[in-house]
Amino acid sequence: MTSHAPESGGLVTESTLGASNSSQTIENKGLTILGISGRRLAAVLIGWFFVIFDGYDLIVYGTVQSALAKEWNLSSATLGTIGSTAFFGMAIGAVFIGRLSDRVGRKAAVIGSVLILSVFTMLCAFAPNPWVFGAFRFIAGLGLGGLVPSVNAMTSDLVPRKTMSAWATVMMSGVPIGGSIAAVLALVVVPSSEEWGWRFMFLIALIPLVVGLPIAMKVIPSDKAIKADHDIREGHDEPAGFKDLLVDRYRWISIWFALATFVTLLAWYGLGTWLPRLMETAGYEFGHALMFTLALNLGAVIGSVVTAWAGDRFGPIRSGVIAAGIAGIALLLLLTYPPVTAVYVILILAGVGTHGTQILIIAAVANFYPSNLRGTALGWALGVGRIGAVVAPQLAGLLLAWNLGVNSNFIMFGTAALLSALALSVLLRLQKTYSVTHKVEIQG
């Protein structure tokens, strides 16, 4: 490379390219967190802010299910179908907007995702019937699905490789933080008004639209500047597309990443969507049911910290095997009808394991693929994997509609977590094989 960073530090701009024949890492000045500062840090933090609202939007439907069922006289099967619409949109958004972030640029993909997510989540508050509500949730899901791979790809381009796993963990910690906010807010807001209580929960989507987007437009660097900055620090990558994920070098790794994400998200999003309703069906009051949801999300926040440490020390895939195994065993323990205190502990462990495993998978994908494939690879894994998120609410509703009881759901979610551990074990084995035959550098 023949370009270098300006002496003043900060992000490279087009005017600085070609200024010198030497290549060096861009200097960071000011407050530094995990190796970045200045505009890079501001861009990454606004991305994290958006992920918090991504997490809020994922959990908010579960907190208002009972109110929707009462207002529109909905069955469990119909509630499951409506719950799946957002996840179906997420699956599509993750694949196509993830790819768009590689082709058009990170900034455009992030801002476009937030715009779609915020506008159509807000419109859910004014839905006159469940069918319009479901349509708005589907379109909002397109933005939901595109946001996480786009933000993670942008973050991976802006942070040093040595702190990439830690930053991936920070990014995804926003999901359970947002979910916790949804659970706490619902305790007060949903019972406050029979007509507008649940609707107000969706008006919160105005915050990223009104507050976040203007800041993002200012602090997220241009796509050309992000690419130039990354090329100077990490080297230039040739253009690549979906087909490159399935060539010999990446084929089985890509397939198993998608399978691992499928079963992990089936467990995580299934719980996030149905836990309040399941606990109410099991005989707990609405307030207690939401507190269980809060425990699940607080466990996921704790899991973000624990998996950051474990992923850095032992590798994301190896740590993911343990995390998913813990979640699976914990969820199956609910079949023993434990006391309330034990239920809280079990759900905290389930949050640590399910969401923590997904964070570790994202970190492994970001570490494994080159920059020109990173957004596409994240979109592939999250897009195909989110079919599990689509299936989970529908299956959970059907299991209840078939009178198979609450425990049938816990069996499904617990088994999914154990299958995630199995899939990651296969990836761990493939990693060892590929590191010999292809010299692939994937942190295990």
Swiss-Prot record:
Result after altering residue 313 to A: Loss of transport activity
One GO CC term on file: plasma membrane
Effect of residue 103 to A: Loss of transport activity
GO MF term (any one): carboxylic acid transmembrane transporter activity
Primary location: membrane
Disulfide bond sites: none
Record's keyword annotation contains Transmembrane helix: yes
UniProt cross-references to InterPro entries, sorted A to Z: MFS, MFS_dom, MFS_trans_sf, Sugar_transporter_CS
Effect seen on changing residue 312 to A: Loss of transport activity
Annotated keywords: Cell membrane, Membrane, Symport, Transmembrane, Transmembrane helix, Transport
Topology of the protein relative to the lipid bilayer: Multi-pass membrane protein
TM annotation in the entry: 42-64, 79-101, 108-127, 131-153, 166-188, 198-220, 252-274, 289-311, 318-340, 344-366, 378-400, 410-428
One Pfam match: MFS_1
Subcellular location: Cell membrane
Outcome of gene disruption: Deletion mutant retains 85% of its transport activity at pH 6.5, but it loses 79% and 88% activity at pH 7.5 and 8.0, respectively.
Effect ascribed to mutating residue 386 to A: Loss of transport activity
Effect seen on changing residue 309 to V: Loss of transport activity
Keyword Metal-binding among UniProt keywords: no
Family named by the database record: Belongs to the major facilitator superfamily. Aromatic acid:H(+) symporter (AAHS) (TC 2.A.1.15) family.
Known role: Transport of gentisate (2,5-dihydroxybenzoate) into the cell. Does not transport 3-hydroxybenzoate or benzoate.
Name this protein carries in UniProt: Gentisate transporter
Origin organism lineage: Bacteria, Bacillati, Actinomycetota, Actinomycetes, Mycobacteriales
